[in-house]
């Protein structure tokens, strides 16, 4: 089956790269706050002062921190309290989640995702990735952030996927081709590659760039440090679990394949056992994922 003609593909590729460069990055004060949360000399007051510039962001942070998932003994009303009860690393993850919400809350019809579904899926993958990292004695908060950011490329590629949707879906249905491979064949790019480019543009750590770029095909992630390879595996498995559970599945969940090699590298025997472990807190995400209301 033929895709778009070569000239159209080249035009799309140029426009995708242009869109990646034009999309706004995280606000500078958020970047500064994340650095403060990495600095052992910082105080909770320093962080709170910086975040106070955006009242809406603070509200989203507190909604996440007060979710049943974290099980705090009382309802918190300030970022300072959140840091005291959850610690700098966890609050850093929450700040980043609340910051990218604005990019993910819309409808992404190219991927058959209604409003809020991309956010719900990303947050679910973040929680499952954190759980897996804990099981394999990895970096839990790094896994959470990598899971949150893994599908960011969809916000750029959505309009282009919508343009080529008919051809992409026919490749998936008629030739049993994974959706991401069909994206690549038709458009010359896929959302994982674009996500990696976006995170590189935002100057975020390579771990997050690789996790986004290879979350569908971890076997292609080669010649990288073991810590990065393991994070790619963690996010791949977390994404697969969430798709199997029907969380924000969208069109690209069609023909999705779980890498047994990734499971083996993580020393995990059964995806069914993993699903049974995460089902309770994933149901909490289903109830609490909206931050914009």
Short names for language-model regions:
Residues 1, 17-18, 262-269:
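Charged, low-complexity surface segments at secondary-structure and domain boundaries
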Residues 1-255, 293:
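Conserved alpha-helical "signature site"
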Residues 250, 258-265:
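A hydrophobic, small-residue-rich beta->alpha segment in the mid-to-C-terminal subdomain
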Residues 263-292:
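C-terminal accessory extensions/subdomains outside the catalytic/core fold
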């Amino acid at each position: 089956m033929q895709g778009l003609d070569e000239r159209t593909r080249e035009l799309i590729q140029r426009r995708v790269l242009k869109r990646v460069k034009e999309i706004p990055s995280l606000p500078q004060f958020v970047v500064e706050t994340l650095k403060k949360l990495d600095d052992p000399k910082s105080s909770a007051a320093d962080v709170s002062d910086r975040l106070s510039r955006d009242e809406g962001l603070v509200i989203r942070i507190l909604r996440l921190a007060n979710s049943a998932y974290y099980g705090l003994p009382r309802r918190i009303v300030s970022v300072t309290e959140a840091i005291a009860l959850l610690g700098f690393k966890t609050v850093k993850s929450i700040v980043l989640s609340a910051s990218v919400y604005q990019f993910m809350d819309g409808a992404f019809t190219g991927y058959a995702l209604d409003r809020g579904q991309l956010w719900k899926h990303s947050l679910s993958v973040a929680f499952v990735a954190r759980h897996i990292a804990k099981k394999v004695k990895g970096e839990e908060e790094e896994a959470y952030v990598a899971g949150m950011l893994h599908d960011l490329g969809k916000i750029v590629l959505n309009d282009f996927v919508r343009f080529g949707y008919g051809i992409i879906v026919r490749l998936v249905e008629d030739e049993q081709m994974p959706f991401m491979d069909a994206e690549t064949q038709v458009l010359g790019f896929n959302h994982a590659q674009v996500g990696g480019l976006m995170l590189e543009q935002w100057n975020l750590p390579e771990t997050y760039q690789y996790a986004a770029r290879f979350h569908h095909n971890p076997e292609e992630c080669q010649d990288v440090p073991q810590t990065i390879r393991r994070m790619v595996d963690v996010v791949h498995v977390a994404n697969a679990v969430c798709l199997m559970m029907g969380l924000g599945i969208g069109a690209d969940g069609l023909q999705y394949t779980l890498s047994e090699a990734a499971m083996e590298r993580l020393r995990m025997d059964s995806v069914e056992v993993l699903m049974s472990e995460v089902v309770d807190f994933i149901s909490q995400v289903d109830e609490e994922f909206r931050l914009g209301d």
